[in-house]
Amino acid sequence: KLTEVAPFTVDLLLPSGAENLNYVLYTDESPYKMQREWLDRLPFDIYSVNVHTGAKRLIGRSYRTAPKWSVNGKWAVMYDPIAQVWNKFDGATGKVVNISDAIGYPMFMESYDKPAPAPAYGIAGWTADGNNVFLYDAYDWWKIDLTGERQPECLTKGYGRKHGKSIRKMTSNIDKDVFQKDEKVIVSLWDKDTMDEGVYQLDMKGRLRKLMEGNYVYTIHRFSDNHEYCVWNRQNVSEFRDLWWSKSDFSNPVKVTNANPQQA
């Protein structure tokens, strides 16, 4: 027996292990195609479909970002830009459940001033077992138990909000979306008042360790293959973004370029 899961004109969203699910998702932008003339990116609707019967159900309208499946393929996490909440979709039951209201803080960019729904602050990553997702608010990381057994937990223990600093994962050649229990993540702490930035190490118990900090904006370019060394730069209004070399914990830094000496 063949069952149509989705029309050929839509985007089917399948996780790894999809053969074990009862429900999957697809997105359909066809209701919004007339808006292509004035929108950079078309919104889309999200449907769930029973893979056994082909029965389809509309579960989200006018989305801007596609759902993301957990690494174990059991749940899809998706941000509803109209309701301004995060939901989870259960691939076994087809149910959609709000997972962010219990946090108590906005999960969307409150100062967003473009003619479109405010986007979410985003997803920081997942635990290796796929049962938890880490979401950003304006300042901190929140650990959400997708099994529903535990309430949301502020991984960073409110440090970011208390000190007015936004804690975000830094981009590099070794950054990850999936974190082991002993993972240590390189994050930036950006002060919204002074614009100063710090580079810290965050572990999965929420402990922060300062690596470097100052009146700069930092960018990590690359860690060495053995993860012992790093190339990065820092800059501010009076210092050009020269390259620096250091150990992977940013100790013993050495300036390796002098590209714009007249700025000093």
Predicted regions mapped to residue ranges:
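Short, solvent-exposed loop/turn segments at conserved positions within beta-propeller repeat blades
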Residues: 37-43, 81-82, 135-136, 191-196, ...
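Short coil-to-beta transitions that initiate beta-strands within beta-rich domains
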Residues: 29, 62-64, 69-70, 111-129, ...
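Beta-propeller fold detector
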Residues: 2-4, 57-60, 96-109, 151-160, ...
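Beta-propeller blade signature
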Residues: 1, 42-53, 88-94, 143, ...
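Repeat-solenoid scaffold signature
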Residues: 83, 112-154, 227
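Short, conserved, GDST-rich strand-edge loop motifs in beta-rich repeat architectures
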Residues: 1, 25-43, 108-125, 129-131, ...
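Non-catalytic accessory segments flanking enzyme active sites
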Residues: 1-20, 25, 33, 164-264
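A conserved hydrophobic secondary-structure block that centers on an alpha-helix together
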Residues: 9, 20-26, 42-84
